[in-house]
């Protein structure tokens, strides 16, 4: 299958090239001269042909998992994690495997800062990237000076050329400023000594101590969920009605700025025909903000129990947890705890899927997050319709 290259992307934007442009055998047609004469080939077409070896490499990397359009960003993460960049050949191979236009894959990959795209003829970046936060909190603690120092040491040959240092926006680790990230490992209180030690030894940042599933259950965690799971249909409806009244009486409001009543929002979503979905926004990107990182890294089951409670009250069938790519330790611990929660049987029929962002600040906005979960660029949606009516995959979304 022939894929569009960079020239096609600039020329067509989001449009796919008609299938009739190329013959069925995948051979590009000769170019037409000014007099209508056919021109011979000038060489291999740039970025258009799928390289079988690259396609096979991506197929092996992805394994036997069923390919889903909404998982495109995760597949891009897998390639970035494996090779340290996204080459045009690998993107073409991925597009071919997913039966998507190359333009569509490229525009998604190029939208997110954590993907390093390498076009034909471009030199691949160093194999290892260390991002040093230069946002406000870290800047005040010497982040910019540290970045300059590490870059100077690399220029002087004191650090291997396979390592590069780049500035980064807020990593959500303001409590340990200045912070740095060596791939998926956070380095708190970063300085030349501990960064050199990380470069030399590759010592990862350990998962923090937190209240795990067993300890949370021992403190009466999920007791209400157990009662809801065990209730008859009539008893369940009565319990949900009482819980919804309690939520409304509590006068809780959203913290996104509009202050919309939480109880009313949940009731609105519950009023639409299903299936109903939920998206948990863990993509805080405001400089100086790390509240989500704090509670998720210390007491994750408090959030997860809230998800299960909402699933009963609103009738949610599937929930997506969208977590910042800058929080790898949280992604690791949530993966572990979700497996324990599923094994316990408390989830019932609810599905929970963990998604990671890719460094796009705008995805903290709810509709941009929805677009990203669907595997697209994180562009905010026009409203109405509101997400409560038509959100994720056009379903009512809490």
Give the positions of each predicted feature.
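Feature of Fe-S/electron-transfer and energy-metabolism proteins
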Residues: 2-398
């Amino acid at each position: 299958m022939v894929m569009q290259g960079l020239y096609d992307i600039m020329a067509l934007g989001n449009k796919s090239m008609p299938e009739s442009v190329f013959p069925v055998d995948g051979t590009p047609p000769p170019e037409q001269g000014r007099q209508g004469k056919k021109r011979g080939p000038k060489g291999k077409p740039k970025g258009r042909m799928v390289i079988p070896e690259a396609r096979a490499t991506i197929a092996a990397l992805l394994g036997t998992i069923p390919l889903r359009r909404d998982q495109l960003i995760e597949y891009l993460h897998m390639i970035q994690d494996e090779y340290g960049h996204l080459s045009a050949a690998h993107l073409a191979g991925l597009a071919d495997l997913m039966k998507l236009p190359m333009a569509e894959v490229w525009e998604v990959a190029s939208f997110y800062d954590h993907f390093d795209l390498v076009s034909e003829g471009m030199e691949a970046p160093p194999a290892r990237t260390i991002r040093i936060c230069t946002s406000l909190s870290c800047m005040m603690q010497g982040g910019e000076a540290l970045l300059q120092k590490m870059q100077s040491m690399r220029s002087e040959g004191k650090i291997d050329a396979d390592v590069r240092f780049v500035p980064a926006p807020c990593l959500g680790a303001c409590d340990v400023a200045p912070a740095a990230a060596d791939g998926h490992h956070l380095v708190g209180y970063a300085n030349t000594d501990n960064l050199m030690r990380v470069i030399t030894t590759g010592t990862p940042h350990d998962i923090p101590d937190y209240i795990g599933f067993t300890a949370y259950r021992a403190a009466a965690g999920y007791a209400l969920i157990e009662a809801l799971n065990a209730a008859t249909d009539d008893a369940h409806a009565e319990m949900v009605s009482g819980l919804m009244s309690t939520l409304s009486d509590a006068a809780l409001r959203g913290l996104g700025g509009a202050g919309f009543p939480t109880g009313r929002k949940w009731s609105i979503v519950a009023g639409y025909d299903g299936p109903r979905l939920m998206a948990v926004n863990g993509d805080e990107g405001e400089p100086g903000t790390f509240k989500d990182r704090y509670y998720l890294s210390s007491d994750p089951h408090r959030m997860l129990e809230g998800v299960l409670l909402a699933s009963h009250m609103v009738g949610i069938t599937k929930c997506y947890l969208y977590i910042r790519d800058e929080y790898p330790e949280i992604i690791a611990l949530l993966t572990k705890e979700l497996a324990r929660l599923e094994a316990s049987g408390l989830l019932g029929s609810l599905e929970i899927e963990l998604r990671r962002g890719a460094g796009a600040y705008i995805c903290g906005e709810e509709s941009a997050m929805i677009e990203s979960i669907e595997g697209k660029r994180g562009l905010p949606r026009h409203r109405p319709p509101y997400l409560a009516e038509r959100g994720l995959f056009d379903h009512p979304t809490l």
